Amino acid sequence: MLFLDEFPEFQPAALDSLRQPMESGDVTIVRANYRVTFPARFMLVGAMNPCRCGKAGDPGFSCRRGANERCAAEYQGRLSGPLLDRIDLHIEVPAVSAADLILPAPAEGSREVAARVARARDAQAKRYAALGMPGIRTNAQAHGPALEEVAKLDNAGLALIRDAADAMRLSARGYHRVLRVARTLADLDVAEKIGRVHLSEALSYRALADEARRAA
């Protein structure tokens, strides 16, 4: 797990250096006449404010740096499109108010969620083993033919992702990442096939990235 807080505050070159290991799961160091490749498979979690002052989108707030939209666009524009394209889940988390703190706990607690994730991972490992792919244990490791084998869509799903690909300008990488997330959501629901609801949710997690690219 690699957690980067205040994501856009890192140097753009440093952030973009993560692109290759995020894609391949390894990193190659070249020095003089030597070239060495190390394993570097990790899960990246980045957290950021919507803008430098952190108030963009708040009702009744006027940014001292100018228009709220401009402040947010400039700040979020520090993240390159190719980097954003490699992040599968883009989630907006609203500020927590004092009133939120006294609300009852969610119906599904952390322990229940962890158990559901463990069951999904176990199901994935068994699926790939049954397909003769023992080197793959999770959907995150599935690429190309392996992913296409386990993430087949019905006609309704194909129509949905075709329309979304045009509207959201999905890259080939983005398309495959949506399939991977949809397959995982189906596994969490103990569903044999990817349903429209799983595909729709997977696409929704890329909507914020699409907005950021348009703003930039």
In which residue ranges do the predicted regions lie?
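Walker B beta-strand of ABC/ABC-like P-loop ATPase nucleotide-binding domains
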Residues: 2-6
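Basic, amphipathic alpha-helical bundle interface domains used for macromolecular binding and assembly
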Residues: 7, 13-215
